[in-house]
Amino acid sequence: LGDYLAEDELDGIRICREVVSHLNWRKKGPGATLPIDEPLYDQEELLGLVNEDLRVPFDIRDVIARTVDGSRFEEFKPLYGPTLVTGWASIHGYPIGIVGNNGPLLSEPSEKAAQFIQLCNQIDVPILFLHNITGYIVGTDFEQGGITKNGSKMINAVANSTVPHISIIVGASYGAGNYGMSGRAYGTRFTYIWPTAKIAVMGPKQMAGVMSIVQRAAAERRGIEFDEEADAKRAGIAEHWAEERSKGLFATSRVSDDGMIDPRDTRTVIAISLSICHNQDVAGTKEFGTWRM
């Protein structure tokens, strides 16, 4: 039995859209509550912000300014932990908290992120994570300074947060940094990537370097001469292998995200995602307080 007859697949999709448009669906969550203004900066410029070489830095605020309503961004603690940008804005009238990378994650930005994520839960605001992260900083000084403890605060806050998370990987998203920035494994409501995205346990050069260190140490333990030529060849193969498999196209082809998007469509994609999130009540967990510095 059927109520409609479609000529082909496209006609069937058209009929489905018409049926859905008359369902009179009402969202449980709040709708857009703030003024909807186009960004003051040209969204076409998003195409040139991220260099093909991800070692070339860029300011994540440039992405934010070309994405949010009226380019308005109320930054939270801008002078503390400046390698992580946090603050509030709106996209198509939907309030949103934003967490974006401007360098590696150290103790201070990790603490700032933990507090900000919990604040967003206190006021029931979804969070947008903009990834360009090589990971948490490592080294004796940083470890003695508490990076493990403070980094875990951020991951703890991400894991316990119940407001919708939307992640967009604009550059690198490596290792534990991916977890701290609410990667796919942390149940984000939506995850999108730009064509410039790279996702891996670590950068290709770093991985090849670690392999060389391990092989060199093994040769020393066995008391044999280390073959530099073979090591260079092996490292080159490993680096190429890791480079190809860290590309965004490789990841998205395996459905590890919700799609690769044109950077110029970022604002529209986020707005649609927020609208979907607001089909249900947007409620943050109130079971923990706000961590102070």
Where in this protein do the model-derived segments appear?
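Ligand-binding clefts of soluble mixed alpha/beta catalytic domains
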Residues: L1-M293
